[in-house]
A protein has these predicted regions:
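Single conserved hydrophobic/aromatic residue that forms the stacking wall/gate
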Residues: 1-10
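Structured loop/turn residues at beta-strand edges in well-structured enzyme cores
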Residues: 5, 93, 183
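Proteins synthesized as precursors that undergo proteolytic processing into mature forms
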Residues: 15-179
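In a subset of proteins, long, contiguous C-terminal domains/tails are tracked
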Residues: 161-212
Length: 212
């Protein structure tokens, strides 16, 4: 017997709400073949059937602008600006690194932070993923209603008081979040000697790094 009055909903909406969303996968096999994919779309949920035509637009087709004479204006043969950024990096012409994340307009921002930390600052995959993350909503959103927040910056509080205070002094409109709350990054790498490495964010307990 379960008392209905005793049932409580999950305090974290991100866990209590069950719905489909973007995912990201990085895979490297023993031969060095690599794949980086970011399946997304949700077109059955987010795009109605086009009247008289009988098919849906995938969600990235929503990124077309209906105003004329823009680079992403809706027109035959054109592709819209897309947020999906599954990435492969080469070293001396050889595939070396596969990485990516879900996250809409934040994907490029989070991935650039990871890539620079790994390649230019020498952090290993997991350390580069674990470092604090940030993103901005200054640019108009890719999805309707295409809102923007000029000068805004969201960052994890683990950047530290000095950094946060300096950003405010420079005029950024900050939203400071809890630690381990921004980013969904994963990455896999093949060393020149064939050793395979992987890293996955612990944020929200949604990502895994697995080898066999």
């Amino acid at each position: 017997y379960i008392s209905v009055t005793g049932v409580q909903t999950c305090a974290l909406p991100i866990f209590s709400e069950k719905r489909g969303d973007t995912v990201h996968i990085d895979v490297i096999d023993r031969h060095g073949n690599m794949v980086s994919v970011t399946p997304s779309g949700g077109w059955l949920q987010s795009s109605p059937t086009v009247p008289g035509l009988g098919f849906c637009l995938n969600s990235r087709a929503q990124m077309f602008w209906l105003a004329p004479d823009l680079p992403t204006s809706l027109a035959p043969g054109k592709r819209p600006r897309t947020t999906l950024t599954p990435s492969l990096a080469l070293h001396e012409g050889r595939p070396t690194l596969s990485f990516g994340t879900p996250g809409g307009d934040q994907q490029d921002q989070w991935q650039l932070s990871f890539f620079l930390r790994h390649v230019h600052h020498g952090l290993d995959l997991q350390a580069a993923i674990d470092r604090p993350l940030f993103h901005t909503a200054h640019f108009p959103g890719s999805f309707h209603p295409r809102t923007r927040e000029p000068g805004s910056l969201m960052l994890e509080e683990t950047f530290g008081v000095a950094t946060i205070d300096e950003l405010r002094r420079r005029g950024h409109r900050l939203t400071v979040t809890e630690p381990w709350s921004i980013g969904r990054l994963t990455a896999a790498k093949r060393d020149p000697d064939g050793l395979l490495r992987a890293g996955a964010t612990p944020r929200l307990m949604q990502a895994y790094a697995i080898g066999r």
